[in-house]
Amino acid sequence: MEKIESYFVPFGRLLLAVIFIMAGASKIASGGAGMIEYMESAGVPGILFWPAALFELIAGLMILVGYQTKLVAFLLAGFCLLTGALFHYVPADQTQMTMMFKNFGMAGGFLFLARFGAGEMSMDNRASSED
């Protein structure tokens, strides 16, 4: 069982990272079509589209490889809480409320990474073992 358990953290990082990698890449590829208006309808300035899209992509990749994991996971936890509250708090819409709580659940996963780190199979661990 120990051998299998050694893959839990990197697999968990993959599961947490993939949504941000895909969302960031998709937003960048779309050039903001529809998203800027959606952001503005929630009271978020459209000028934040590009920084948010780049953050999603880069932060997702950093979590995937386990680089600067504690910091990036903390930032992603905040991002998930903020976007969940800003874009998905619609009490009359059960789907949006489910999306909000999904974001909050991901924030919980990121807080675990922020506290405990990326694990053995990560760039963070590789860098610390070379010191």
What do these predicted regions represent?
Residues 1-30, 37, 46-54, 58, ...:
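Extended, low-polarity transmembrane helix blocks
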